[in-house]
A protein has these predicted regions:
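Non-catalytic connector elements of ABC transporters
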Residues: 238, 251-361
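Helix-to-loop junction immediately C-terminal to a conserved catalytic motif
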Residues: 51
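ABC ATPase nucleotide-binding domain helices that frame the ATP-binding cleft
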Residues: 44-47, 143
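ABC ATPase nucleotide-binding domains
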Residues: 71-230
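Conserved ABC transporter NBD signature motif
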Residues: 59-67
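The feature captures the beta-strand-to-loop junction immediately N-terminal to the Walker
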Residues: 36-38
Length: 361
């Protein structure tokens, strides 16, 4: 039985403001689910509904098989880590860690045991007598996580806990979180707009947009088999190339070449083709199957160049394809020939935006 389950969850503020729409998903023990999406997609509202900080308009929330939809937060045995850490500035690290346990009136020996165990796991033993103002951002974040751990909850909820950290510290704390939650036996629900956090931390990802779950899957499936145009464009950096192409006789026309479309796909007059910049290959100029274009922009990313290539299409005008090229690769910086491996091409319905692959696989 799933430890956390959302069934047809909705939240309506006004007829025009509906941040959560028909969300149904489950998170088992030891699973790490990330709610990923842009600002305003409904991910934080969904987390607040799970926490009991807001009440759903309709739908059901269950934890451990028990319906908690209308239970107050204190009766759900959840622990939440906030973006702002939510530490008491006048308390020491020790006092912050044990404050929730004292409110639950646990015996002092048990409180001290739990706090000592968590302090050892998080490396906080030498900080126990300091106050938050005397700590770095990374240390404060570890204490916020520690406050959640000492509760021994049925579900962990984390609301963008790394967004206040600088890039280097965020990378280090992200690795710490991955190791830490791999040892926990309860579900984790994590909210972020950062796809790197979602891809590296999660066992599964729910991509949200406009209140709906666009795709719920393992991170590698989200990346390699996007269900629709939104997921394809939102997940991946640099962004996937998405080109609207004319079609005829089971081929799409791009520049001087025609690209075969799988025979099992229905083919209207136009389709949207997608391919990620890292999957495009440089071809020899004499290769007849290659697409030829002119380099319009080169961006140095360190290990790679991100190269924008103009492709002339006699029917639809000039199109831009972006390709990642290793920085140690020699290539013509003016004219370039490209190959699009068919196994890395995605096809999307121009009207619905849905992946054609998802219809047939």
């Amino acid at each position: 039985m799933p430890k956390l389950e959302l069934h047809n969850l909705n939240k309506t503020y006004t007829p025009k403001i509906i941040p959560v729409k028909n969300i149904t998903l489950s998170v088992d023990d030891r699973e790490f689910l990330t709610l990923l999406g842009p600002s305003g997609c409904g991910k934080s509202t969904a987390l607040r509904l799970i926490a009991g900080l807001e009440t759903p308009t309709h739908g059901r929330i269950s934890i451990g098989g028990k319906d908690v939809t209308h239970q107050p937060p204190g009766d759900r045995n959840i622990a939440m880590v906030f973006q702002s850490y939510a530490l008491y500035p006048h308390m020491t690290v020790y006092e912050n860690l044990c404050s929730g346990l004292k409110l639950k009136r646990l015996p002092l020996p048990e409180i001290n045991q739990r706090v000592a165990e968590v302090a050892q796991v998080l490396g906080l033993e030498d900080l126990m007598h300091r106050k938050p103002a005397q700590l770095s951002g990374g240390q404060r974040q570890r204490i916020a996580v520690g406050r959640a751990l000492v509760r021994r909850p049925d579900v962990f909820l984390l609301d963008e806990p790394l967004s206040n950290l600088d890039a280097l510290l965020r990378e280090r704390v992200r690795a710490d979180l991955k190791q830490l939650f791999a040892t926990q036996s309860v579900p984790v629900v994590y909210v972020t707009h950062d796809q790197t956090e979602a891809m590296t931390l999660s066992t599964k990802v729910a991509v949200l947009n406009n209140g709906y779950v666009q795709q719920l899957d393992q991170p590698e499936q989200i990346y390699n088999r996007p269900a629709n145009l939104f997921v394809a464009g939102f997940v991946g950096s640099p962004q996937m190339n998405l080109l609207t192409l004319d079609c005829e006789r089971q081929h799409a026309i791009l520049g001087d070449i025609s690209i075969p479309i799988p025979a099992s796909f229905p083919v209207p007059t136009q389709l949207i083709m997608g391919i990620r910049p890292e999957h495009i290959q440089i071809a020899k100029p004499e290769d007849l199957a290659a697409i030829r274009g002119r380099v319009s922009l080169v961006e140095n990313l360190g290990m790679h160049y991100l190269v924008s290539v103009e492709i002339h299409n006699s029917r639809l005008g000039t199109m831009i394809i972006r390709v990642l090229i290793p920085s140690d690769r020699n290539w013509n910086t003016e004219e370039i020939s490209l190959m699009l491996p068919p196994q890395h091409i995605h096809w999307f319905d121009i009207d619905t935006g849905n992946s054609l692959r998802s219809r047939t696989s």
